[in-house]
Regions:
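Glycine-rich phosphate-binding loop and adjoining helix at the ATP-binding site
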Residues: 76-131, 217
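Short beta-strand-loop/turn "lid" adjacent to the catalytic site in phosphate-handling enzymes
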Residues: 44-100
């Protein structure tokens, strides 16, 4: 999201998480956050910002392996989501900026990116992606299980088996819109520990009520 980059090392066979490695978060500088905000508003040089974002991710990869004494040759693959600029699956449209070729060149590691487009073009929602990872985590958990992920957009994953009964969908706005509101109303960057939210009341009429599976359109 616009806060920065989360980078993590995991060992996986593609079906389950075999080992959880180190992770770090690299905050974006205020000026770069503004560039992302401008792109979402339809302003700015998309290609220039995309390259800058990609190189910031390359720096995050470098910091991760350096801080935890990992050889880059031991990294087989980088999953690169990029940054969502617009998302409207009803019109078979989604756009995440991030140059996979540039990241591969900068790091020397193969990159998988543009993770949503094919699903959206095939008539899917393209979101959320988290349930795929949650399914891998659930292989070591007792079922049924529910995982709630509150990121920029909140989503939930539910499974009673690990066959075809995995359900995952967006539950509504997460920290992205909340952070924007907090910044506008208080000048702070976020609601620390949910203090302000805990003082409020739920407006049932404003809840996102369309049936699952669903995503939150941006």
């Amino acid at each position: 999201d616009r806060d920065g980059i989360d980078a993590a090392l995991i060992k996986t066979d593609g079906y389950q998480v075999l080992e959880e490695g180190p992770f770090l978060t690299v905050p974006y500088k205020t000026a770069f956050r503004k560039l992302l905000e401008n792109l979402i508003a339809g302003k700015g040089d998309l290609n220039k910002v995309e390259d800058q974002l990609t190189l910031e991710h390359a720096k995050a990869v470098s910091a991760l392996i350096k801080n935890f004494n990992v050889a880059i040759s031991d990294v087989d693959l980088i999953g690169f989501h990029g940054h969502t600029i617009s998302h409207n699956p009803d019109k078979q449209h989604t756009l995440q900026i991030g140059n996979g070729g540039l990241l591969a060149s900068a790091t020397g590691v193969d990159v998988v990116n543009d993770l949503r487009s094919s699903d959206v073009k095939a008539g899917g929602q393209g979101a959320p992606l988290a349930p795929i990872y949650h399914k891998a985590l659930m292989k070591s958990q007792d079922l049924p299980a529910i995982i709630l992920n509150i990121g920029g957009v909140a989503n939930i994953t539910w499974a009673d088996t690990l066959d075809e009964n995995l359900i995952g969908f967006d539950t509504g706005p997460g920290n992205a819109l909340i952070d924007d509101w907090i910044k506008k109303k208080t000048g702070r960057h976020y609601d620390n520990n949910g203090f302000l939210a805990s003082q409020g009341q739920v407006h049932d009429c404003l809840l996102y009520t369309s049936p699952s599976p669903r995503d939150l359109r941006l």
